[in-house]
């Protein structure tokens, strides 16, 4: 059919045989066939063992055998395109966290993400041709309506089989959706996406569905094709198999999933009857024998294939494959085409670029256009299962236990991964990685992003730091940071920080007794215990600024030397340990923000570390009443080395897990943590594990201790290049490798991961701008490179 624009250009509508919807999920074609399409999420493959992938391939072959019918055809499409759904609006408490999120999305993610969409199409043909001539004679008799009803029943039966078999792949049958009172055809939108590589809404119209799809002008030539839209134009080229690979394997075309440009991979498979299939194999064998072909092994395999076909180990079909690559201009198209062609050739096929058949190859991408297929070939259902894996990179989850995803990362395939902090309702996370690889930066980034989950829920984040690495992030987000140092006022004053409640009375009695008995000289007498209870009651009745350990001591016996008062004296202000808990003010605020504690200098000072931990965790525990709460600990192995601190933490964590709390831990080598009974228990409870690359990873620790698979261990030790800023996220629901490269956000990295020199530099800026609590931050981000070692 000639187009209106000239004698050499055809109207695109003649290639679009779609009449319209018979129902929400079924479309009628001009030749009387009916069609149904599903979008498939795909299953993760990157870190999966080959045995599982082989099993899926066998299961797909079994499905094809079960639905084999010469009146049925299957199309499989992979569309890699740039229409990535936007993240949900994000709301933060602090200006810095909002700025960090915006910078990350604009500098790291913007323009760097593509999406892989798989589509599966089933086409059921009428038992007899229902073309235009046939319809004239059957219109009045009603036979066509009966035949069509039978086709629809057949389609639904087939669809139930397919949907059941592919349930694990995330199959979503396309139909009609409504938005703001307007009906849109999802099937039409999928067809248009296959045609153009770009998503555009397609409304339901009263006329031809095909006409409603063709809204952009397509011009085909021998070198390529051009698609002209009202906004712009872009070009494409199509590649096909000239010769098939000698062998097929699961996911053999998966290299296309990670290319950094749009493409459309089309495959069709029309079942052959068994006599037709045997004839194909016999003809090929006879041709090789009559020509004196010396490929004896191949001839023998053809004979084996005939036996397998007779045994129903597979079925055969007419297969067609094409790859359409898109670019903005011809120069870019040449480079992209060469790269795509190389990826396909790596699968073992001989790949050619379409020339004179470009127009037919382009339109053959659309389901139902069998007459335009170029270079079809007969293959087995096993081969087809290898070509069509429906494998993909994980997408994460748009929402979880605490609401919408808090961050988006980029996978190895350049696709978006939406990160939620929970696996089901468990928010226990462990991060492992060698020093300097970025684990602290990632942990602090996650803590900043968690503001979204806290802002409307009065939630709290508590962070136990090591060497002040997270101090700048805590201060930048308006939080409180206490660096506890031996011999200087700690900011911990339990008598002044606790309210006058029964819980405070009980805690202080046990806590003061522990202080007294920490000298190893035994317990206190019943009389001293009664005096202590009265003293605590009296102290808590005062205003906070009037309370002190020294004042409490007045209620106890000062002599003899083994008396409780005498033993408590060293903890009073002005004495050896008075700096620890008897200061002028208690600085533990725990308001709806982030509070950081650096106990690095106390970890080896067991006498102070244990009661400090007990007080902090008591204060934290009071916040855990069902409200959202996050406890995070950097280099937590150092905390585990203190047995008293470990004991307090172990008891405390049970409360966290039961009351909507989260735990995020980070450390360098897992083997050091696994040696600790508490560490091993903690890691086992962490449903989310994040690994940075480690060339020295210990096999026993990662596989036996952390339950990594062989593929995951290989990725950690070999595949993830050190310094690439990639991490492996492991969960029961699946594993994925993501990028976290902030090389274009140096000023934010300086805040997320503090070093000794940058912490000192920031402290000087804060001192210079005393009274302006937030002014130091912008100056620091502008001048962080001036920090001297």
From Swiss-Prot:
Residues that bind ATP: 433-440
Key words of the record: ATP-binding, Crown gall tumor, Nucleotide-binding, Plasmid, Signal
Protein name in UniProt: Protein virB4
Claim: Magnesium is one of the keywords in the record: no
Domain of life: Bacteria
One GO molecular-function entry: ATP binding
Gene3D superfamilies reported for this sequence: P-loop containing nucleotide triphosphate hydrolases
Pfam families, alphabetized: CagE_TrbE_VirB (PF03135)
Role: A possible function of virB4 might be to provide the energy, via hydrolysis of ATP, for translocation of virulence proteins of the transfer of a T-DNA-protein complex across the agrobacterium membrane.
Signal sequence residues: 1-38
Family: Belongs to the TrbE/VirB4 family.
InterPro entries: CagE_TrbE_VirB (IPR004346), CagE_TrbE_VirB_cntrl_dom (IPR018145), P-loop_NTPase (IPR027417), T4SS_component (IPR051162)
PANTHER family, sorted: TYPE IV SECRETION SYSTEM PROTEIN CAGE, UNCHARACTERIZED PROTEIN YJGR-RELATED
Protein source organism: Rhizobium radiobacter
Key word Nucleotide-binding present: yes
